[in-house]
Amino acid sequence: MAQGSRRRKVVLTAGAEGCSSSSGPDMEELLRCAERDLNIDARQLALAPGGTHVVALVSTRWLASLRERRLGPCPRAEGLGEAEVRTLLQRSVQRLPQGWTRVEVHGLRKRRLSYPLSRVLPFEEGSCSPETLTRFMQEVAAQNYRNLWRHAYHTYGQPYSHSTAPSAIPALDSIRQALQRVYGCTFLPVGESMQCLSNVRDGPSRGSSACPSLLRAEALLESPEMLYVVHPYVQFSLHDVVTFSPAKLTNSQAKVLFILFRVLRAMDACHRQGLACGALSLHHIAVDEKLCSELRLDLSAYEMPSEDENQEVSEEKDRTGVKSEKDGEGRPGCPTCQKELRGLVLDWVHGRVSNFYYLMQLNRLAGRRQGDPNYHPVLPWVVDFTTPYGRFRDLRKSKFRLNKGDKQLDFTYEMTRQAFVAGGAGSGEPLHVPHHISDVLSDITYYVYKARRTPRSVLCGHVRAQWEPHEYPATMERMQTWTPDECIPEFYTDPSIFCSIHPDMPDLDVPAWCSSNQEFVTAHRALLESWEVSQDLHHWIDLTFGYKLQGKEAVKEKNVCLHLVDAHTHLTSYGVVQLFDQPHPQRLAGAPALAPEPPLIPRLLVQPIQEATGQEDISGQLINGAGRHVVEVTPCESGWTRERPTAGEDDLEQATEALDSISIPGKAGDQPGSSSSQASPGLLPFSAPSGSRPGRRSKATGLDSGEGDEGKIVLPEGFSPIQALEELEKVGNFLARGLGSQLEEPEKPQAQPPVYLQSLFHRDMQVLGVLLAEMVFATRVRILQPDAPLWVRFEAVRGLCTRHSKDIPVSLQPVLDTLLQLSGPKSPLVVKKGKLDPLFEYRPVSQGLPPPSPAQLLSPFSSVVPFPTYFPALHKFILLYQARRVEDEVQGRELVFALWQQLGAVLNEITPEGLEILLPFVLSLMSEEHTAVYTAWYLFEPVAKALGPKNTIKYLLKPLIGAYENPCRLHGRFYLYTDCFVAQLVVRLGLQAFLIHLLPHVLQVLAGVEASQEEGKGLVGTTEDEENELPVPGPGSCAFGEEIQMGGQPAASSGLGLPDYRSGVSFHDQADLPDTEDFQAGLYVAESPQPQEAEAVSLGQLSDKSSTSEASQGEERGGDDGGAPVDKNSVKSGDSSQDLKQSEGSEEEEEEEEGCVVLEEEEQDEVTGTSELTLSDTILSMETVVAPGDGRDREEEEEPLPEQTEGKEQKILLDTACKMVRWLSAKLGPTVASRHVARNLLRLLTSCYVGPTRQQFTVSCDDSPPLNAGNIYQKRPVLGDIVSGPVLSCLLHIAHLYGEPVLTYQYLPYISYLVAPGSNSSPSRLNSRKEAGLLAAVTLTQKIIVYLSDTTLMDILPRISHEVLLPVLSFLTSFVTGFPSGAQARTVLCVKTISLIALICLRIGQEMVQQHLSEPVATFFQVFSHLHELRQQDLQLDLKGCTEGQLPEATFSDGQRRPVDPTLLEELQKVFTLEMAYTIYVPFSCLLGDIIRKIIPNHELVGELAGLYLESMSPSSLRNPASMEPVTPSAGPEWNPQSGSCLQDDGHSGTFGSVLVGNRIQIPDSQPQSSGPLGSISGVGSGGLSSRNEDNALKRELPRSAHGLSGNWLAYWQYEIGVSQQDAHFHFHQIRLQSFPGHTGAVKCVAALSSEDFFLSGSKDRTVRLWPLYNYGDGTSETAPRLIYAQHRKSVFYVGQLEAPQYVVSCDGAVHVWDPFTGKTLRTVDPSDSRVPLTAVAVMPAPHTSITMASSDSTLRFVDCRKPGLQHEFRLGGGLNPGLVRSLAVSPSGRSVVAGFSSGFMVLLDTRTGLVLRGWPAHEGDILQIKAVEGSVIVSSSSDHSLTVWKELEQKPTHHYKSASDPIHTFDLYGSEVVTGTVANKIGVCSLLEPPSQATTKLSSENFRGTLTSLALLPTKRHLLLGSDNGIIRLLA
């Protein structure tokens, strides 16, 4: 049984590919031995596609035991069928069942290693890499001397000396020892005998590999017959990269060189251990997504087959009979698998091999693998089966085109082309690349074809999940019509494919004209070999494998394949492969053009005989070279090609003999042909109908016209004299250009030389040269056989290198020349074809160097390979990354720290191409669970510094977001929230990008949302209208490093359509997704073009727009609420990884999804006593600034922290985050802090209350529960109050910083927005977000009331009443609006609302309550009456007249009829109980006194209910005042679940801070401490009516802050928070905000730092000053400089910042580089000639560190601040005299610099080449200033009063502005606008995009005195810095 399965596998993997390799028996032997020695089931073994090794499916446990040197039987894959196992062994399959993996088994036959191997070891060049130039030269000299001596000896001395043969050892022993040294482990004996025990007695059982660049070995095994090396499975090789993913290596020579570098390292290690690498190919270099390469040795090259074994192989091949059917029938000579493609093509063209065999060979060359569902061989469908033997298909069109039609393909191409243009080339989205065809044979089609033979489970997994057997095509006719893909070989060879193994699926029916499956297969095969197919098959080859796959021909034929044009960079092992780039020659199916006999020359006199002989015609059948019958074809005149001169007087006998000779079967002339009348131009004329007669001429032979011309020669119809030459040219052109082949020369027998190890090493180097050339000419060498001998590969690539030398990259030309001797002596190389011989002999000394070796090529002093200087450091970095296995956080930190120590050496010399190699490793570290935080902390700053802001945002933003959103709690997580790290983020990302994209994720930690992974999933899109605000899964939603394979789409990060770059980076791909598009769930979703606001960025994109009603309300409110207006598009623009499939109003789905919100919160609730305690201390430590002195009792009363690591970490984390937010709020200033920090915090506040768990009351650990602890009114905060503590703390700190207006102008409008009822939705519409928003609104209002002054409170009291209290009460008392969390949420809201109303009552007094709060109080109490009336009516509602969907109505005592939802009555009764009546009536009767009768009409009813509650209490309860405490939570300024942690001195907390008994207030003595944790939460409470600090409890003063808003600052802030973030225009209102006096001379230049918290100014007083930009005062205050730099000797005319190193550059004729933090001078650059001073300076943008300087002699110089001396020096003026350089500007990319001269001339220079791109007279006057903008735009101003906008390489300006009176001498840029300034003190704003129009404002003397000299704009803050000639700088808005 095992033998049969083995034989079956061999046939499937090797034979069915159309060729049985000569090593087939060898590989069968390897399969047999592996099964026996390794105990692996034969079903789980398969030959690798190249036939070099065996792939095995093994269990991970078996592999683990093998690594431990224990070899047991490998478990069988019991749960998998044979077909499934066969599929899992295919290369394109990446997903394996749990617990299974694949390995590679490489074997060496011991009997073939019996030859002796010379002991001569290589020279010492590889023993140690030369470290100095002297050492390198010494090594070279010594090797040259030895080589020359030995060469002379071998040439002249050895023939005459009778020396003994060199010492040698058996190759087996040498190889065994070398393998053990290389792989660091010993051989494990396996099999029946233990003969090899003696060879492994010493050495470690397992060690480290000699070189990490070598593919590691899992184990070395030895049996009596074999040596085995077991490798991990190689998923991708370099061959896959160059074949299927060539875009991964495009535009980067460094990547190719780095692969070569690592290969050389591996080869060097092997050579030093005495092991040759073998005949390597691209398949032997394993690569991963990061292009990290590892070398896999070719051990089979060591085997030397003997002659008797060769004979055995051929006999075995004959016995198996594979040749007759699989190798191609009737094929003469040796197996074509060993021939070069040239012979194969010629054999097919001349009919010596069958169509089937030839097509299978092409499939094999393309890498297609039998049985691989993604990459199975393809053959054409040739007929449609509708008629007997079918109608032939048009092979000039692809099957996809025939099925879909031209219109469909044109539409697909045009649509994808438009999307491609709109999205930008290289946008990374393959679906939007213009194409016609997606695939030639998809895996689904493959399984449909083989559905009858494939297990049901496989079909359900790949075709359709639900088993529908009758949905599969039932007949061959239906199959051919249905599929757009090509056919598979099984329909031509395998009759069993029609037979179904499924009982409910019928067999696949063959056409009616066939009686059996076998007959159909035979007929189908005959059709494939028919003459009709043969004559057009070359067209199909061109479409499938040839030149019509790419270029104009592909577009013309509608054959553009997606895989070939999408420029994908992910690795894949299948796709469409182009073999030929020239038209394929046609098969010569008719008579040859040059036959042995000449054609008949017809004359008038032989006409009767011709007619007679025509009757003797016999139809013949063509027998092609494969020995199969072809459809009937008859010969015609075009087949008669032999020409014999015949005179006009020749007799009839000669003509008759000629005619008779051509119709005799068996002669050369009997091959059929055809008339050329039906042949296409340029095709062979063999397509006439089979019924034509060869001897008969048509009437169109020209006889009529030539009857009178006796001597005229008339050629036969269709005969072309040059036809044979044309055919020869076509074939020759294809062979030369397409195949690069040449005439084969006879081999000369050569004696077998002895095998020297040194020769093997030379052979390795030659193999390396061949391999490099194959990588360069990957598209041209696909025509070579996969198992072509090395000498064939060498000759092919050497010819390519000679003919196409310009295609070789410059960096590889020297190494290819050295390795392959391309430019050697004129005498041709003698190529040796032995298996162990070098291809040729290297010269002893070539160009002064010895023969190449890995060590020589790796030497930094060798010029053969130009390896960059950073390669060794980068290689060391990657080795360290690969060597460490990180299993916990400690190891993760150690690894990152070690990498950080090495990173400096890498980045010092690295280039952008090197960063492309390094960056995927950094991104991988930032995406791994145990290293993400530490990678961000240690590596972000140096890597971002090298990348620059643009690339940092592109590549590092997504992993940064993932690190912040990752739910895992790590010890070092707080590092990400330190102010120093956030400062780095601001600097490296840019302030605007940080605020928009990253800040919302940073702030999430305050709300605790990041701690709940389940919540993050549950909040993803409960309804469609909530998708913009609920959390969406980002990198933190799944395990770190987990590849999301579903659909092949990388998980988009939250809020941003950011691609995943871990698989590769290319800086050349700069066409990113435009800002107007977002990548969402694989589709483009249109979005507003402005920068995405924080509202649309992740967490809940936690905005408050939780329903359609709220969104519409936001639109109505506009900017009034202090939040940005919500536009309808933004609701749909949130990035989500889920499809937009939730429908609006689907409350059932909403409830189900919200149910999973709080899975982790329940666990948090169980440890409330631990984690909340730590939270309390954190919150209070934050608030010590807000309320100084109030926390003095905290340390005394504080409980010791529980000894739980998680609690401590959470405390540290929140402490750090709150501290960072306080620092950031001050750093950003009032407007930016309000727009970005405060708004995000307000949104987060709502998320703190989402879900039922966060609405549960909590119990503090130090409380002994009262008697009624089970009561829902137990006085304790809800969990949401605990979670929201840090958020409230930060919100109040912002209010403390900037004053009371923050509370009234920003917080209160947002509260109104939260509680506003929806206008467009049904009254019952209340979701979990809205519910949480109500709780958050009431909680925040409690905080606000405490900190408001009396005057302010009275001013806004009507707003609070109408916009907060009444809307909340409308939800709370509604009979039709249900709460998602039921009675619990309504109870919490009720309790909080009572506390809020009571707090306001205490603040304003009884009279004001009656005047302003009577309506809210009455509304609240009225609900008791309504419920009482419904209870008295027995809940009988008026159901009459209620149509379906309408609610019944009830009539109440006030005469009004109101709708009532019967399902909500129970919920309301649970809330408004007797206890609730008692709880609210007693305190309000105390607070309101007698006016309660006027305000509350039903006070008597509520009083009765309260009395009933008192009566229901037991006497014991009445005696215990504590148990009678109403436990209504109340709002206070600060709260904490821990007793004594409150900011107030009072520790008591009753309903309102004390126990209320009857109508008096009683302070209980029995409770020295609060019995509940609400002491500091409860509003009124917290000592609200206590005897201590009563004023502080009800009212707190906001401490005065130096940054408090007043005057102009307040007016500007009020305006600014109402402006939409989507407004891209700059508005100048001339509001004076601050003054900066100090300079004693005119201010010449002003420049803001990138973080916008400081700015620099340079002046005539020879100083540069650094000023802070923090707000002070009311707009009239003056600010002193933070630092003064006074090292200049002249007037300073330029100051700027080098962004990458954060240095300041200033110039006064000499350039000074200094540190802005210390003022220390770092470098001074003086002009080379004092008579030629510097006139203009510009700094290069990050990541560049260069300074550009222009001198008065029109010379441009570049200086790198890190290195001494000049970098470059370019002359700008040329032959002209343009004057002095007045201004310089560098493009944002740093690729060009533009200089403006005093003559108005401008010059554009390429900084990379130094070439002048353009010079033009731009202005008529002096150039005053130039600035460069993104998009190759230049803006220049001149003394001719003009401001002009240019495109870099366009002649005419795009816009031209003219100032009427004064020139624009200074300007700055704001987005697409220019802000200008003139000497007349006028500020103007004009657009770069719209037609010329300018808004101008004259500066008033009150706001600005003096003359404007300089201007700078703060883009994020929207401020202007204006410098004047009096030395004062002013900040205006």
From Swiss-Prot:
Residues 668-693 have a biased composition (Low complexity). Residues 1100-1112, 1131-1140 have a biased composition (Polar residues). Keywords: Cytoplasm, Cytoplasmic vesicle, Endosome, Lysosome, Membrane, Mitochondrion, Repeat, Transit peptide, WD repeat. It is found in: Early endosome membrane; Late endosome membrane; Lysosome membrane; Cytoplasmic vesicle, Autophagosome membrane. The keyword tRNA-binding does not apply. Residues 1-643 are annotated as: Necessary and sufficient for the interaction with SQSTM1. SMART domains: Beach (SM01026), WD40 (SM00320). PROSITE patterns: BEACH (PS50197), WD_REPEATS_2 (PS50082), WD_REPEATS_REGION (PS50294). Its main location: membrane. Interacts with WDR91; involved in early to late endosome cargo transport. Interacts with BECN1; negatively regulates the PI3 kinase/PI3K activity associated with endosomal membranes. Interacts with SQSTM1; the interaction is direct and regulates the interaction of SQSTM1 with ubiquitinated proteins. Interacts with MAP1LC3C; recruits MAP1LC3C to ubiquitinated protein aggregates in the aggrephagy process. Functions as a negative regulator of the PI3 kinase/PI3K activity associated with endosomal membranes via BECN1, a core subunit of the PI3K complex. By modifying the phosphatidylinositol 3-phosphate/PtdInsP3 content of endosomal membranes may regulate endosome fusion, recycling, sorting and early to late endosome transport. It is for instance, required for the delivery of cargos like BST2/tetherin from early to late endosome and thereby participates indirectly to their degradation by the lysosome. Belongs to the WD repeat WDR81 family. This is WD repeat-containing protein 81. It comes from Rattus norvegicus (Rat).
